[in-house]
Amino acid sequence: VLDLRFADITTADYEKLRKKAPNSEILWRIPFQGKTYDQNTDVLYVTSLTDEDVATLDYFTQLKSVEAQECTDYAQLAALAARRPAVAVDYAVTIDGRKYDQDTAVVSVSDITDEEINLLTYLPELTAVTAVGCETPEQMEKLRDFCQEKGISFALRFGTKTYPDTVQELDVTGITDAELELLQLLPELKTLHLVN
């Protein structure tokens, strides 16, 4: 057993030692984001994550969870989740001013940017998107196209009712001007009902 917990060693130093003494157990503190952590650490909290950080996390063999609710390095978080499937990677994605946990299945939006549409890819459990109101019809079209491409259900809310974008008949009684803008996103719509 090599006890190096009080030595200042890098991951490169550790690799050299491991090659020189492959049958020895090496006890050490892992350098990560400017601090050192016990090799048996099972939970880490991060606010940022680089590709190098993702690789360094491999040294934490006991790691069970990475808490990253304030981290917006989504590509690296997704890479970590793919690289270490046994590690829970907890993060949230902000879309249309709301935070959605990575295991969110349904998202509701009224306004969305191109960047936020791309962020939907970091919600691996996402099965449905609902458009509520329509501040930017062009963006909603892009969102609908994205959903179709990814196999995600796209629906629209009119008043208190939600309809899939494949609806053919719709009652528009009492809907708002913003909701009227959504009608252009219903390519199969054939009949409108309006009372009063």
In which residue ranges do the predicted regions lie?
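Concave beta-strand-loop units of leucine-rich repeat
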Residues: 1-10, 21-75, 82-138, 145-182, ...
